[in-house]
Amino acid sequence: MTKNINIAIDGPSGVGKSTIAKKLADHLNYVFINTGLFYRAIAFYKDKFNLTQDLLVKELKNIKINYVNEDQIFLNNQDIAPYLRDEKISEQASEISTILDIRNFINQIIIDTMKVKKGYVIEGRDTTFKLAPDAEVRIFLDASSPIRARRRVLQNSQLNTESNYEKILDNINKRDYSDRNREVDPLHVAQGVIAIVNDHMNIEETFEKILGLVNEAIDKK
């Protein structure tokens, strides 16, 4: 019987973390956790009620997130998944991710979930060093900002969502700066994490490289 492990994938926005993590989870029949969608859910709540950051923190006690998968995310019993890819929500999610109370709120939900069993693919910032530091496979996936912007434009076009390359590139650069320089858990390659730069790799090539590392880890169990 194959033994399950945990896999954590970290990295900047738009690098393909979600796509790769979902593909791995499907292939291995694991549970996929996209941590960024938790922040987007909180950002959606903030935007919906036009809250300041201080009021948002006070409202956390009234927020219940039920994460089924990336296509079903319930916020106080409302499925909000279709709204979470909006660029405005994405920008606000990055802003509120610097708030310690919000990070702790979301982190605890995820940590409690992963205590139950092995067999998770968790994707998002902080995953490799805070949420899943003991994961058997920890990856930091990276790519240049122009490459990531072009990928985002392509992704949006496939979803029939209009987008502007220059605006997306500017947003990515601003988000990178914010994520790498924030006081709370800045984006970085943690000790023992395998860094993979996939500028010149497509999704399938990136998937196969990481799957090879996963199979090696499973064989060692």
UniProtKB/Swiss-Prot annotation:
UniProt-recorded name of the protein: Cytidylate kinase
Record family assignment: Belongs to the cytidylate kinase family. Type 1 subfamily.
CDD domains per UniProt: CMPK
An example Gene Ontology CC term for this record: cytoplasm
Gene3D superfamilies: P-loop containing nucleotide triphosphate hydrolases
EC numbers for this chain: 2.7.4.25
HAMAP family xrefs: Cytidyl_kinase_type1 (MF_00238)
UniProt keyword annotations, A-Z: ATP-binding, Cytoplasm, Kinase, Nucleotide-binding, Transferase
Encoding gene, per UniProt annotation: cmk
EC class (word): transferase
Single GO term (MF): CMP kinase activity
Catalytic activity: CMP + ATP = CDP + ADP; dCMP + ATP = dCDP + ADP
